[in-house]
Curated annotation (Swiss-Prot):
It is found in: Cytoplasm. Residues 261-513 are annotated as: Disordered. Pathway: Protein modification; protein ubiquitination. GO terms for cellular component: cytoplasm; nucleus. Belongs to the RNF25 family. Its main location: cytoplasm. A zinc finger (RING-type) spans 124-191. It is an enzyme of class 2 (transferase). Residues 9-117 form the RWD domain. Zn(2+) 1 binds at C124, C127, H147, C150. The gene is rnf25. Coiled coil: none annotated. This is E3 ubiquitin-protein ligase RNF25.
Amino acid sequence: MAAESDVLSEIEVLQSIYLDELNVTQNDEGGWTVSLVLHPSTAEDCLSQFVRLTLTMDLDSQYPYSSPYISIHNPRGLSDDKLLSLQKSLQMEAEECVGTPVLYQLIERAKEILTDSNIPHGNCVICLYDFKEGEVFTKTSCYHYFHSHCLGRYITHSEMELKDRERELEEDKTRDRTEEEELAVVCPVCRESLTYDLDALLSSPAPVLCQQEDAVIGGEFKKKWEALQKILERQKEKGGVIDPEAESNRFLIHINEAPVNLSDTPGMTDSSGAESSQSLPSSSPDSTSTTQTSQNQHTAGQPQRKHTGDFKRGRRGRGAGRGGPARHMVPAPGEERLGKHIQSSDKINSANSGPTNTTSQVESTAQRQACELSENTAQLRQPLTNEENKPVSQDMLTSEPKDGQEVSQQKECISKEVTQTILQEGHPEREHVGRGDKRGSRGSARHHGHWQDRNYKGPGHWDNSGSAGHRGGAYRTREGGAGRGHRGGGAYRGGGRGMHQRVEKEFRKEGVL
Protein backbone atom coordinates (compact mmCIF):
# COMPACT_ATOMS: atom_id res chain seq x y z
CA MET A 1 0.00 0.00 0.00
CA ALA A 2 2.90 2.33 0.76
CA ALA A 3 4.38 1.77 -2.73
CA GLU A 4 1.08 2.58 -4.40
CA SER A 5 0.72 5.77 -2.42
CA ASP A 6 4.24 6.81 -3.42
CA VAL A 7 3.34 6.37 -7.14
CA LEU A 8 0.15 8.42 -6.79
CA SER A 9 2.00 11.23 -5.02
CA GLU A 10 4.69 11.33 -7.74
CA ILE A 11 2.04 11.48 -10.51
CA GLU A 12 0.28 14.37 -8.75
CA VAL A 13 3.55 16.31 -8.62
CA LEU A 14 4.15 15.75 -12.35
CA GLN A 15 0.63 16.91 -13.22
CA SER A 16 1.17 20.08 -11.26
CA ILE A 17 4.38 20.81 -13.20
CA TYR A 18 3.44 19.91 -16.76
CA LEU A 19 -0.27 20.55 -16.41
CA ASP A 20 -2.21 19.42 -19.46
CA GLU A 21 0.86 18.19 -21.34
CA LEU A 22 1.05 15.13 -19.11
CA ASN A 23 -1.19 12.16 -19.88
CA VAL A 24 -1.64 9.45 -17.19
CA THR A 25 -3.65 6.21 -17.53
CA GLN A 26 -4.00 3.11 -15.30
CA ASN A 27 -4.14 -0.38 -16.82
CA ASP A 28 -5.99 -3.48 -15.61
CA GLU A 29 -2.98 -5.04 -13.92
CA GLY A 30 -2.57 -2.14 -11.51
CA GLY A 31 0.20 -0.43 -13.44
CA TRP A 32 0.39 3.10 -14.83
CA THR A 33 1.29 4.63 -18.23
CA VAL A 34 2.73 8.16 -18.30
CA SER A 35 3.29 9.96 -21.63
CA LEU A 36 4.42 13.48 -22.45
CA VAL A 37 5.15 15.48 -25.65
CA LEU A 38 8.57 17.11 -25.32
CA HIS A 39 10.05 20.09 -27.16
CA PRO A 40 13.43 21.81 -26.93
CA SER A 41 13.80 24.57 -24.37
CA THR A 42 13.65 27.75 -26.52
CA ALA A 43 12.02 30.22 -24.08
CA GLU A 44 8.60 29.44 -25.54
CA ASP A 45 9.66 30.40 -29.06
CA CYS A 46 7.67 27.94 -31.10
CA LEU A 47 9.32 28.95 -34.38
CA SER A 48 12.72 27.94 -33.04
CA GLN A 49 11.63 24.48 -31.99
CA PHE A 50 12.69 22.16 -34.81
CA VAL A 51 12.52 18.78 -33.07
CA ARG A 52 10.05 17.01 -30.86
CA LEU A 53 9.05 13.56 -29.58
CA THR A 54 6.54 11.77 -27.39
CA LEU A 55 8.09 10.07 -24.34
CA THR A 56 6.14 7.12 -22.89
CA MET A 57 6.98 5.40 -19.55
CA ASP A 58 5.21 2.18 -18.53
CA LEU A 59 5.14 1.50 -14.75
CA ASP A 60 4.32 -1.92 -13.33
CA SER A 61 2.91 -2.69 -9.89
CA GLN A 62 6.43 -3.06 -8.39
CA TYR A 63 7.49 0.51 -9.21
CA PRO A 64 9.73 2.18 -7.83
CA TYR A 65 11.47 -1.09 -7.02
CA SER A 66 11.51 -1.95 -10.73
CA SER A 67 12.66 0.30 -13.54
CA PRO A 68 10.02 1.68 -15.94
CA TYR A 69 9.95 0.66 -19.62
CA ILE A 70 10.77 3.68 -21.84
CA SER A 71 9.60 4.10 -25.46
CA ILE A 72 9.64 7.00 -27.93
CA HIS A 73 6.80 7.78 -30.35
CA ASN A 74 6.13 10.35 -33.07
CA PRO A 75 9.63 11.80 -33.37
CA ARG A 76 10.21 14.82 -35.65
CA GLY A 77 13.52 16.12 -36.91
CA LEU A 78 15.55 13.35 -35.33
CA SER A 79 17.45 10.61 -37.10
CA ASP A 80 17.10 6.96 -36.23
CA ASP A 81 20.53 6.84 -34.71
CA LYS A 82 19.73 9.81 -32.52
CA LEU A 83 16.50 8.26 -31.32
CA LEU A 84 18.21 4.97 -30.53
CA SER A 85 20.94 6.64 -28.48
CA LEU A 86 18.35 8.73 -26.63
CA GLN A 87 16.32 5.68 -25.66
CA LYS A 88 19.40 3.78 -24.43
CA SER A 89 20.61 6.66 -22.28
CA LEU A 90 17.21 7.07 -20.61
CA GLN A 91 16.89 3.34 -19.96
CA MET A 92 20.33 3.19 -18.33
CA GLU A 93 19.53 6.13 -16.09
CA ALA A 94 16.24 4.51 -15.01
CA GLU A 95 18.03 1.27 -14.07
CA GLU A 96 20.56 3.19 -11.99
CA CYS A 97 17.83 4.82 -9.88
CA VAL A 98 15.85 1.71 -8.95
CA GLY A 99 13.99 2.16 -5.57
CA THR A 100 13.54 5.93 -5.91
CA PRO A 101 11.08 8.09 -7.91
CA VAL A 102 12.72 8.68 -11.34
CA LEU A 103 9.94 9.97 -13.66
CA TYR A 104 10.70 13.67 -13.39
CA GLN A 105 14.44 13.01 -13.83
CA LEU A 106 13.83 11.07 -17.06
CA ILE A 107 11.58 13.78 -18.52
CA GLU A 108 14.12 16.52 -17.94
CA ARG A 109 16.93 14.39 -19.35
CA ALA A 110 15.02 13.85 -22.57
CA LYS A 111 14.26 17.57 -22.86
CA GLU A 112 17.96 18.40 -22.52
CA ILE A 113 18.87 16.01 -25.34
CA LEU A 114 16.20 17.59 -27.57
CA THR A 115 17.55 21.05 -26.87
CA ASP A 116 21.02 19.97 -27.85
CA SER A 117 19.69 18.38 -31.02
CA ASN A 118 17.48 21.27 -32.07
CA ILE A 119 18.75 21.07 -35.64
CA PRO A 120 16.64 19.34 -38.30
CA HIS A 121 18.22 16.12 -39.38
CA GLY A 122 17.85 14.56 -42.79
CA ASN A 123 17.15 16.23 -46.13
CA CYS A 124 14.45 18.21 -47.82
CA VAL A 125 11.94 15.72 -49.22
CA ILE A 126 11.18 18.08 -52.13
CA CYS A 127 14.67 18.66 -53.54
CA LEU A 128 16.28 15.65 -51.76
CA TYR A 129 19.32 17.69 -50.63
CA ASP A 130 20.63 18.04 -47.08
CA PHE A 131 20.22 21.18 -45.00
CA LYS A 132 23.34 23.31 -44.74
CA GLU A 133 24.34 26.29 -42.65
CA GLY A 134 23.04 29.57 -43.98
CA GLU A 135 20.13 28.01 -45.88
CA VAL A 136 16.62 29.17 -45.06
CA PHE A 137 14.31 26.32 -44.16
CA THR A 138 10.81 26.08 -42.76
CA LYS A 139 9.24 23.85 -40.13
CA THR A 140 5.61 22.97 -40.59
CA SER A 141 3.07 22.47 -37.83
CA CYS A 142 3.59 18.71 -38.18
CA TYR A 143 7.33 19.17 -37.56
CA HIS A 144 8.54 18.43 -41.07
CA TYR A 145 11.27 20.54 -42.57
CA PHE A 146 11.72 21.92 -46.07
CA HIS A 147 13.72 24.58 -47.80
CA SER A 148 11.56 27.68 -47.82
CA HIS A 149 11.94 28.17 -51.57
CA CYS A 150 11.20 24.49 -52.28
CA LEU A 151 8.08 24.59 -50.13
CA GLY A 152 6.86 27.75 -51.92
CA ARG A 153 7.17 26.08 -55.35
CA TYR A 154 5.37 23.00 -54.05
CA ILE A 155 2.49 25.08 -52.70
CA THR A 156 2.18 26.96 -56.03
CA HIS A 157 1.89 23.70 -57.94
CA SER A 158 -0.61 22.31 -55.43
CA GLU A 159 -2.85 25.37 -55.74
CA MET A 160 -2.98 24.98 -59.53
CA GLU A 161 -4.07 21.37 -59.12
CA LEU A 162 -6.72 22.40 -56.62
CA LYS A 163 -8.20 24.89 -59.10
CA ASP A 164 -8.40 22.21 -61.77
CA ARG A 165 -10.06 19.88 -59.29
CA GLU A 166 -12.64 22.51 -58.36
CA ARG A 167 -13.43 23.08 -62.04
CA GLU A 168 -13.96 19.35 -62.56
CA LEU A 169 -16.28 19.17 -59.57
CA GLU A 170 -18.35 22.08 -60.86
CA GLU A 171 -18.73 20.44 -64.27
CA ASP A 172 -19.66 17.10 -62.71
CA LYS A 173 -23.46 17.01 -62.58
CA THR A 174 -23.68 13.59 -60.96
CA ARG A 175 -21.94 14.50 -57.68
CA ASP A 176 -23.82 15.07 -54.47
CA ARG A 177 -24.01 18.79 -53.72
CA THR A 178 -24.60 18.22 -50.04
CA GLU A 179 -21.21 16.57 -49.51
CA GLU A 180 -18.68 19.26 -50.31
CA GLU A 181 -15.10 18.01 -50.52
CA GLU A 182 -12.68 20.15 -48.55
CA LEU A 183 -9.66 21.01 -50.69
CA ALA A 184 -6.44 22.23 -49.07
CA VAL A 185 -2.68 22.09 -49.53
CA VAL A 186 -1.26 19.25 -47.46
CA CYS A 187 2.17 18.28 -46.24
CA PRO A 188 4.06 16.19 -48.80
CA VAL A 189 5.14 13.79 -46.02
CA CYS A 190 2.19 13.20 -43.69
CA ARG A 191 -0.71 14.82 -45.67
CA GLU A 192 -1.63 17.17 -42.86
CA SER A 193 -3.10 20.54 -43.83
CA LEU A 194 -0.56 23.36 -43.98
CA THR A 195 -0.72 27.00 -42.95
CA TYR A 196 1.71 29.14 -44.95
CA ASP A 197 2.64 32.55 -46.32
CA LEU A 198 3.28 31.94 -50.02
CA ASP A 199 4.91 35.30 -50.77
CA ALA A 200 7.41 34.93 -47.92
CA LEU A 201 8.31 31.42 -49.00
CA LEU A 202 8.89 32.35 -52.65
CA SER A 203 10.99 35.37 -51.68
CA SER A 204 13.43 33.15 -49.77
CA PRO A 205 16.72 32.33 -51.53
CA ALA A 206 16.89 29.04 -53.36
CA PRO A 207 19.18 26.36 -51.90
CA VAL A 208 22.59 25.85 -53.43
CA LEU A 209 22.53 22.50 -55.14
CA CYS A 210 26.04 21.11 -55.38
CA GLN A 211 26.97 19.14 -58.45
CA GLN A 212 27.89 15.56 -57.70
CA GLU A 213 31.42 14.79 -58.76
CA ASP A 214 32.04 11.87 -61.07
CA ALA A 215 32.74 8.78 -59.06
CA VAL A 216 36.08 7.18 -59.62
CA ILE A 217 35.65 3.70 -61.04
CA GLY A 218 37.91 1.32 -59.17
CA GLY A 219 39.19 -2.13 -60.02
CA GLU A 220 36.67 -3.87 -57.80
CA PHE A 221 33.80 -2.14 -59.52
CA LYS A 222 35.11 -3.21 -62.94
CA LYS A 223 35.40 -6.83 -61.82
CA LYS A 224 31.89 -6.74 -60.43
CA TRP A 225 30.61 -5.21 -63.66
CA GLU A 226 32.26 -7.93 -65.77
CA ALA A 227 30.76 -10.66 -63.61
CA LEU A 228 27.30 -9.13 -63.90
CA GLN A 229 27.75 -8.75 -67.65
CA LYS A 230 28.43 -12.49 -68.00
CA ILE A 231 25.30 -13.26 -66.01
CA LEU A 232 23.30 -10.96 -68.28
CA GLU A 233 24.57 -12.67 -71.43
CA ARG A 234 23.75 -16.10 -69.99
CA GLN A 235 20.24 -14.97 -69.13
CA LYS A 236 19.74 -13.60 -72.65
CA GLU A 237 20.79 -16.92 -74.19
CA LYS A 238 18.29 -18.80 -72.03
CA GLY A 239 15.51 -16.28 -72.70
CA GLY A 240 15.46 -14.90 -69.18
CA VAL A 241 15.68 -11.24 -70.25
CA ILE A 242 12.66 -9.67 -71.94
CA ASP A 243 13.39 -7.04 -74.57
CA PRO A 244 10.41 -4.62 -74.67
CA GLU A 245 11.18 -3.47 -78.21
CA ALA A 246 11.46 -7.02 -79.56
CA GLU A 247 8.27 -8.07 -77.80
CA SER A 248 6.36 -5.08 -79.22
CA ASN A 249 7.46 -6.03 -82.78
CA ARG A 250 6.84 -9.73 -82.27
CA PHE A 251 3.52 -9.85 -84.13
CA LEU A 252 4.28 -6.98 -86.50
CA ILE A 253 3.47 -7.73 -90.14
CA HIS A 254 5.88 -6.22 -92.66
CA ILE A 255 4.17 -5.06 -95.85
CA ASN A 256 7.39 -4.25 -97.72
CA GLU A 257 8.47 -7.85 -98.13
CA ALA A 258 8.92 -9.26 -101.66
CA PRO A 259 5.91 -11.23 -102.96
CA VAL A 260 6.18 -15.00 -103.08
CA ASN A 261 6.81 -16.41 -106.56
CA LEU A 262 4.00 -18.82 -107.46
CA SER A 263 6.25 -20.85 -109.75
CA ASP A 264 8.51 -21.74 -106.79
CA THR A 265 5.60 -22.85 -104.61
CA PRO A 266 5.04 -26.64 -104.74
CA GLY A 267 1.58 -27.96 -105.48
CA MET A 268 0.54 -25.23 -107.89
CA THR A 269 -1.45 -26.11 -111.01
CA ASP A 270 -0.08 -26.05 -114.53
CA SER A 271 -2.22 -23.08 -115.44
CA SER A 272 -0.81 -20.97 -112.62
CA GLY A 273 2.70 -21.97 -113.65
CA ALA A 274 1.95 -20.98 -117.24
CA GLU A 275 0.63 -17.58 -116.13
CA SER A 276 3.69 -16.93 -113.97
CA SER A 277 6.00 -17.93 -116.82
CA GLN A 278 4.16 -15.60 -119.19
CA SER A 279 4.49 -12.70 -116.77
CA LEU A 280 8.30 -12.98 -116.57
CA PRO A 281 10.14 -10.51 -118.83
CA SER A 282 12.55 -11.82 -121.48
CA SER A 283 15.93 -10.20 -121.98
CA SER A 284 17.16 -12.04 -125.09
CA PRO A 285 15.80 -13.87 -128.19
CA ASP A 286 16.96 -17.20 -126.78
CA SER A 287 15.03 -16.68 -123.56
CA THR A 288 12.01 -15.58 -125.63
CA SER A 289 12.03 -18.77 -127.70
CA THR A 290 12.49 -20.88 -124.55
CA THR A 291 9.53 -19.19 -122.86
CA GLN A 292 7.33 -19.62 -125.92
CA THR A 293 8.25 -23.31 -126.16
CA SER A 294 7.27 -23.87 -122.50
CA GLN A 295 4.00 -22.02 -123.10
CA ASN A 296 3.25 -24.21 -126.10
CA GLN A 297 3.87 -27.31 -124.05
CA HIS A 298 1.48 -26.11 -121.33
CA THR A 299 -1.12 -25.20 -123.95
CA ALA A 300 -0.79 -28.57 -125.68
CA GLY A 301 -1.13 -30.36 -122.35
CA GLN A 302 -4.39 -28.67 -121.34
CA PRO A 303 -6.53 -29.94 -124.31
CA GLN A 304 -5.25 -33.45 -123.68
CA ARG A 305 -6.60 -33.37 -120.14
CA LYS A 306 -9.91 -31.94 -121.34
CA HIS A 307 -10.14 -34.59 -124.10
CA THR A 308 -9.53 -37.38 -121.64
CA GLY A 309 -12.17 -36.01 -119.28
CA ASP A 310 -14.67 -35.95 -122.17
CA PHE A 311 -13.94 -39.61 -122.92
CA LYS A 312 -14.56 -40.64 -119.32
CA ARG A 313 -17.82 -38.74 -119.14
CA GLY A 314 -18.92 -40.16 -122.51
CA ARG A 315 -18.25 -43.69 -121.30
CA ARG A 316 -20.39 -43.15 -118.21
CA GLY A 317 -23.31 -41.82 -120.22
CA ARG A 318 -23.74 -38.79 -117.95
CA GLY A 319 -21.33 -35.91 -118.26
CA ALA A 320 -22.07 -34.17 -114.94
CA GLY A 321 -19.46 -36.10 -112.95
CA ARG A 322 -16.01 -34.75 -112.27
CA GLY A 323 -13.39 -36.72 -114.19
CA GLY A 324 -9.95 -37.15 -112.69
CA PRO A 325 -6.70 -37.73 -114.55
CA ALA A 326 -7.02 -40.34 -117.31
CA ARG A 327 -5.27 -43.64 -117.08
CA HIS A 328 -4.19 -43.76 -120.75
CA MET A 329 -2.85 -40.48 -122.09
CA VAL A 330 -2.83 -40.71 -125.93
CA PRO A 331 -1.64 -37.56 -127.72
CA ALA A 332 -3.83 -36.25 -130.54
CA PRO A 333 -2.23 -36.13 -134.03
CA GLY A 334 -3.41 -32.62 -134.79
CA GLU A 335 -1.94 -31.34 -131.57
CA GLU A 336 1.48 -32.84 -132.35
CA ARG A 337 1.53 -31.27 -135.79
CA LEU A 338 0.38 -27.96 -134.32
CA GLY A 339 3.19 -27.98 -131.74
CA LYS A 340 5.83 -28.73 -134.40
CA HIS A 341 4.59 -25.95 -136.67
CA ILE A 342 4.60 -23.51 -133.75
CA GLN A 343 8.17 -24.45 -132.89
CA SER A 344 9.26 -23.89 -136.48
CA SER A 345 7.51 -20.52 -136.54
CA ASP A 346 9.23 -19.57 -133.27
CA LYS A 347 12.59 -20.28 -134.87
CA ILE A 348 11.65 -18.00 -137.77
CA ASN A 349 10.69 -15.28 -135.28
CA SER A 350 14.02 -15.57 -133.51
CA ALA A 351 15.76 -15.34 -136.89
CA ASN A 352 13.78 -12.23 -137.82
CA SER A 353 14.40 -10.56 -134.45
CA GLY A 354 18.20 -10.74 -134.85
CA PRO A 355 20.13 -7.70 -136.09
CA THR A 356 20.58 -7.56 -139.89
CA ASN A 357 23.49 -5.52 -140.99
CA THR A 358 24.11 -6.76 -144.55
CA THR A 359 22.08 -8.48 -147.31
CA SER A 360 24.30 -11.56 -147.28
CA GLN A 361 23.59 -12.23 -143.61
CA VAL A 362 19.84 -11.99 -144.21
CA GLU A 363 20.00 -14.42 -147.14
CA SER A 364 22.12 -16.96 -145.25
CA THR A 365 19.81 -16.82 -142.23
CA ALA A 366 16.73 -17.23 -144.42
CA GLN A 367 18.23 -20.19 -146.27
CA ARG A 368 19.12 -21.92 -143.00
CA GLN A 369 15.62 -21.41 -141.62
CA ALA A 370 14.10 -22.64 -144.92
CA CYS A 371 16.13 -25.83 -144.72
CA GLU A 372 14.98 -26.47 -141.16
CA LEU A 373 11.40 -25.76 -142.16
CA SER A 374 11.60 -28.16 -145.11
CA GLU A 375 12.93 -30.90 -142.84
CA ASN A 376 10.09 -30.41 -140.37
CA THR A 377 7.41 -30.39 -143.04
CA ALA A 378 8.91 -33.48 -144.72
CA GLN A 379 8.21 -35.40 -141.55
CA LEU A 380 4.62 -34.24 -141.56
CA ARG A 381 4.08 -34.73 -145.30
CA GLN A 382 3.25 -38.46 -145.16
CA PRO A 383 0.48 -38.39 -142.47
CA LEU A 384 -1.01 -35.28 -143.99
CA THR A 385 -1.15 -36.94 -147.44
CA ASN A 386 -2.74 -40.13 -146.11
CA GLU A 387 -5.39 -38.41 -144.00
CA GLU A 388 -6.26 -35.23 -145.80
CA ASN A 389 -5.01 -35.86 -149.40
CA LYS A 390 -3.87 -32.30 -149.37
CA PRO A 391 -0.13 -31.92 -148.96
CA VAL A 392 1.62 -28.70 -148.18
CA SER A 393 2.36 -26.57 -151.25
CA GLN A 394 5.75 -27.48 -152.72
CA ASP A 395 6.19 -24.07 -154.28
CA MET A 396 6.12 -22.49 -150.88
CA LEU A 397 8.59 -25.01 -149.43
CA THR A 398 11.13 -24.81 -152.28
CA SER A 399 11.06 -21.06 -152.57
CA GLU A 400 13.96 -19.38 -150.84
CA PRO A 401 13.21 -16.07 -149.11
CA LYS A 402 15.41 -13.24 -150.12
CA ASP A 403 14.57 -10.78 -147.39
CA GLY A 404 12.69 -10.51 -144.08
CA GLN A 405 9.38 -9.65 -145.79
CA GLU A 406 9.28 -12.93 -147.79
CA VAL A 407 10.03 -14.91 -144.62
CA SER A 408 7.07 -13.32 -142.82
CA GLN A 409 4.79 -14.02 -145.82
CA GLN A 410 5.93 -17.64 -145.82
CA LYS A 411 5.08 -17.90 -142.09
CA GLU A 412 1.58 -16.57 -142.72
CA CYS A 413 0.99 -19.07 -145.56
CA ILE A 414 2.09 -21.98 -143.40
CA SER A 415 -0.12 -20.85 -140.53
CA LYS A 416 -3.18 -20.57 -142.78
CA GLU A 417 -2.63 -24.00 -144.32
CA VAL A 418 -2.17 -25.55 -140.88
CA THR A 419 -5.45 -23.98 -139.77
CA GLN A 420 -7.30 -25.26 -142.83
CA THR A 421 -5.81 -28.74 -142.36
CA ILE A 422 -7.03 -28.95 -138.77
CA LEU A 423 -10.47 -27.63 -139.75
CA GLN A 424 -10.83 -30.20 -142.54
CA GLU A 425 -9.56 -32.86 -140.18
CA GLY A 426 -12.32 -32.07 -137.69
CA HIS A 427 -15.29 -32.23 -140.16
CA PRO A 428 -15.29 -36.00 -140.89
CA GLU A 429 -15.00 -36.70 -137.19
CA ARG A 430 -17.98 -34.51 -136.48
CA GLU A 431 -19.97 -36.19 -139.26
CA HIS A 432 -19.28 -39.56 -137.70
CA VAL A 433 -20.33 -38.30 -134.29
CA GLY A 434 -23.41 -36.58 -135.66
CA ARG A 435 -24.83 -39.74 -137.24
CA GLY A 436 -25.24 -41.22 -133.79
CA ASP A 437 -24.52 -44.84 -134.66
CA LYS A 438 -25.53 -46.33 -131.37
CA ARG A 439 -23.92 -49.72 -131.91
CA GLY A 440 -21.17 -48.79 -134.31
CA SER A 441 -17.68 -50.07 -133.82
CA ARG A 442 -15.25 -47.66 -132.15
CA GLY A 443 -12.54 -48.66 -134.59
CA SER A 444 -14.73 -47.97 -137.63
CA ALA A 445 -13.41 -47.06 -141.05
CA ARG A 446 -14.94 -43.63 -140.64
CA HIS A 447 -11.98 -42.67 -138.48
CA HIS A 448 -9.12 -41.29 -140.54
CA GLY A 449 -5.58 -42.48 -140.00
CA HIS A 450 -4.22 -45.81 -138.91
CA TRP A 451 -3.13 -44.35 -135.54
CA GLN A 452 -6.37 -42.51 -134.79
CA ASP A 453 -7.18 -43.26 -131.15
CA ARG A 454 -10.64 -43.95 -129.92
CA ASN A 455 -10.34 -41.24 -127.33
CA TYR A 456 -9.69 -38.54 -129.89
CA LYS A 457 -12.75 -36.49 -130.72
CA GLY A 458 -11.25 -33.94 -132.99
CA PRO A 459 -10.98 -30.25 -132.26
CA GLY A 460 -14.50 -30.11 -130.88
CA HIS A 461 -13.16 -29.24 -127.43
CA TRP A 462 -12.32 -25.78 -128.82
CA ASP A 463 -15.96 -25.18 -129.71
CA ASN A 464 -18.08 -23.85 -126.83
CA SER A 465 -21.31 -24.85 -128.58
CA GLY A 466 -20.56 -28.56 -128.20
CA SER A 467 -19.61 -28.56 -124.50
CA ALA A 468 -18.67 -31.89 -123.00
CA GLY A 469 -20.54 -31.01 -119.80
CA HIS A 470 -23.91 -32.05 -121.30
CA ARG A 471 -25.28 -35.44 -120.58
CA GLY A 472 -24.65 -38.05 -123.22
CA GLY A 473 -21.62 -38.58 -125.43
CA ALA A 474 -20.39 -39.45 -128.89
CA TYR A 475 -20.52 -43.19 -128.34
CA ARG A 476 -23.61 -43.53 -126.16
CA THR A 477 -26.69 -41.43 -126.81
CA ARG A 478 -29.91 -41.62 -124.90
CA GLU A 479 -32.46 -41.32 -127.68
CA GLY A 480 -30.40 -42.54 -130.62
CA GLY A 481 -30.13 -39.05 -132.03
CA ALA A 482 -27.17 -37.51 -133.78
CA GLY A 483 -26.52 -34.68 -131.30
CA ARG A 484 -23.07 -34.88 -129.78
CA GLY A 485 -23.65 -33.32 -126.41
CA HIS A 486 -27.46 -33.39 -126.20
CA ARG A 487 -29.97 -35.84 -124.88
CA GLY A 488 -32.43 -35.54 -127.79
CA GLY A 489 -32.04 -36.51 -131.43
CA GLY A 490 -31.57 -32.99 -132.75
CA ALA A 491 -28.80 -32.15 -135.13
CA TYR A 492 -25.53 -30.76 -133.88
CA ARG A 493 -25.64 -26.97 -134.00
CA GLY A 494 -21.95 -26.15 -133.70
CA GLY A 495 -20.99 -24.52 -137.01
CA GLY A 496 -17.62 -24.64 -138.73
CA ARG A 497 -17.46 -20.86 -138.89
CA GLY A 498 -17.52 -20.45 -135.16
CA MET A 499 -14.89 -23.10 -134.79
CA HIS A 500 -12.71 -21.45 -137.40
CA GLN A 501 -12.88 -18.18 -135.49
CA ARG A 502 -12.14 -19.99 -132.29
CA VAL A 503 -9.05 -21.66 -133.75
CA GLU A 504 -7.80 -18.39 -135.14
CA LYS A 505 -8.14 -16.79 -131.70
CA GLU A 506 -6.16 -19.63 -130.16
CA PHE A 507 -3.43 -19.23 -132.76
CA ARG A 508 -3.27 -15.48 -132.24
CA LYS A 509 -2.76 -16.07 -128.53
CA GLU A 510 0.08 -18.45 -129.23
CA GLY A 511 1.74 -16.04 -131.65
CA VAL A 512 1.26 -18.11 -134.83
CA LEU A 513 -1.00 -15.68 -136.72
